[in-house]
Amino acid sequence: RWPSREEVEEALKAWLSRHPIPGLLAAGYFGSYARGEAGVGSDLDLLLLVAHSPLPPWKRPLGLSLEELPVPAEALVYTLEEWKGLPQRSPRLARVLREETRWLLPPP
């Protein structure tokens, strides 16, 4: 049996409490789990907003222990400045994230 959205959300909350992320401002998830469409093989798409980061966006998730979550997971990690500029840089992605994201820790 594949984990339900409720099980995954509880595991994500516990994971966030065990792994403090420096400068974390907001945390949520989007995609099939957020839409309530997850099934066997679905992964968890995380969205994390941080105050700032010296790393490029593609390197930021590398230090996260995502393998501890009950389903495969990927993360987008944006600085607040990048998040605010996302609608201009990538309007479609910004719209999807705005409409789908279930926030556990809402953005400021």
Sequence positions of predicted segments:
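Catalytic core of pol beta-like nucleotidyltransferases
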Residues: 1-28, 34-41, 50-108
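Short beta-strand->loop micro-motif that forms the acidic, two-metal-ion catalytic signature
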Residues: 46-48
